[in-house]
């Protein structure tokens, strides 16, 4: 996304990836993204490691690292330091602890760090905690999922890939200005969903995924 924005402003941009640019996308979406980057004049080098030369402006995007949360006493964590939780988002080591977001490792391998995950997991956690307070049974379905992946490819172009609830590409790929407008709508709604949920609890509609 950053490369496309810079290239659109007439900067010379080279993307170097130790893997494949857009590897998280399906084949059709990845092809469309590569085509747009070439159209903007980006040079793309896959499966390569390099050392930036002095004087070059380098934007390093090395992926996500979870925020570690110290607990006393310590709780079970995954290999990358996230708090292991069950399908009710509780630590099996200490059920008093509810963990959500990038610091948590739920039993759902399809979940990825994203606002889409955070919104639905936050709503599920709220339902679970409310059931604790009201002493009612917790929700039976705590699985969350996805509808699409949105990517910005410059100010006037985007990419929207439809996916199944477990994040597998399963439909058409939308590109161009229309896809960019969808991306902008999602960005605007993300903030609005939070505001509406604060004003009226339960108004956010959870995107359901595979049962955990």
Residue ranges of each PLM-predicted region?
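Short glycine/serine/threonine-rich phosphate/pyrophosphate-binding segments
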Residues: 1-2, 67
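FAD-site-proximal beta/loop scaffold in flavoenzymes
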Residues: 52-53, 57-120
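FAD-binding beta-loop-beta segment adjacent to the flavin cofactor pocket
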Residues: 81-98, 142, 155-166, 171
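Rossmann-like dinucleotide-binding cores of NAD(P)H-dependent redox enzymes
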Residues: 2-47
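C-terminal auxiliary extensions adjacent to catalytic cores
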Residues: 155-212
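Hydrophobic/aromatic beta-strand patches that form the interior of the parallel beta-sheet core
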Residues: 14-16, 45, 59, 98-100, ...
């Amino acid at each position: 996304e950053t490369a496309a924005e810079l290239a659109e402003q007439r900067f010379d941009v080279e993307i170097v990836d130790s893997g494949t640019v857009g590897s998280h996308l399906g084949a059709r979406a990845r092809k469309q993204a590569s085509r747009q980057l070439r159209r903007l004049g980006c040079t793309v080098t896959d499966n390569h490691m390099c050392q930036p030369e002095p004087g070059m402006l380098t934007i390093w995007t090395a992926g996500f690292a979870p925020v570690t949360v110290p607990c006393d006493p310590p709780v079970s964590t995954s290999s990358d330091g996230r708090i292991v939780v069950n399908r009710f988002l509780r630590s099996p080591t200490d059920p008093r602890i509810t963990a959500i977001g990038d610091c948590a490792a739920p039993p759902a391998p399809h979940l990825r760090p994203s606002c889409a995950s955070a919104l639905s997991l936050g709503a599920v956690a709220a339902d679970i905690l409310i059931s604790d307070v009201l002493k009612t049974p917790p929700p039976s379905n705590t699985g969350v999922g996805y509808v699409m992946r949105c990517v910005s490819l410059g100010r006037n172009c985007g990419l929207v890939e439809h996916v199944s609830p477990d994040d597998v590409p399963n439909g058409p790929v939308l590109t161009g200005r229309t896809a960019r407008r969808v991306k902008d709508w999602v960005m605007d709604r993300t903030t609005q969903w939070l505001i509406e949920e604060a004003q009226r609890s339960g108004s956010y509609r959870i995107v359901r995924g595979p049962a955990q």
